[in-house]
Amino acid sequence: MDVYQTEEQQVEAIKGFWKENGTAVIAGLVLGFAGFIGFNVYKDTQLENEVLTSDAYQTVMESAGVDGKAFSASASKFIAENKDSSYASLTALALAKEAATHKDWPQVAIHLASAIESSSNQGIKAIASVRLARVQIQLEQYTEALATLSVTLPESFKSAIEETKGDAYFKQGKVELARNAYQAALDVEGQTNNGALQMKLNDLAQLSSIAK
């Protein structure tokens, strides 16, 4: 036997359902539609913010290499206002480059450390880390340089990382560790014809023979 024996009973059942639950259903539909609109508004707002940030970044970069002081001021302001943006780390790298033109190595190190901290991109982190380690070697901060390179970084940067480690070890007078690092850098695929690296290894060999 059917639950509903006639069309009239079905109609009355529908009426009863809407009488009891209609408000909740309509509210749910309204909220769902509002949520859909809200999500799209959020996406549109997010996109708009990204475009504005991109435009601001381009404006800051236009002054790079033209007016150092103005660029440093506007770039620092941009980073402070956009700490969570991927552009913050790129701006920090640009500030490091600007400071390097004046051989202000301590300031270069500060900007590179900022780029490492603010970036979620492993490639940018690796670039900034290798550059920071080289600057730390320039500042005779050899232990700090090795610590900078001790974190996990993309395998594609292994050659540059090992070579920089070798430079730090060499400056510390740790010839064997330097040789191992240079060899590890040279052993990376595609680096077998790296003349500069091979020269460093040859120089170490000569130093070792003289020491004997």
Please tell me what each predicted stretch does:
Residues 34-55:
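Transmembrane signal-anchor/signal-peptide helices with a preference for the extracytoplasmic
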Residues 41-45, 79-82, 117-119:
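Flexible helix-coil transition and linker loops at the boundaries of alpha-helical arrays
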Residues 1-31:
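N-terminal positive-inside, membrane-proximal cytosolic segments immediately preceding the first
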Residues 8, 47-54, 69-72, 90, ...:
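Amphipathic alpha-helical repeat elements characteristic of tetratricopeptide repeat
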Residues 88, 92, 100-212:
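Soluble extracytoplasmic domains of inner/organellar membrane proteins
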Residues 27-35, 63-74, 101-109, 135-143:
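Helix-turn-helix repeat elements of alpha-solenoid scaffolds
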Residues 17-24, 81-84, 118, 155:
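Membrane-interface junctions
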Residues 58-90:
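Short extracytoplasmic
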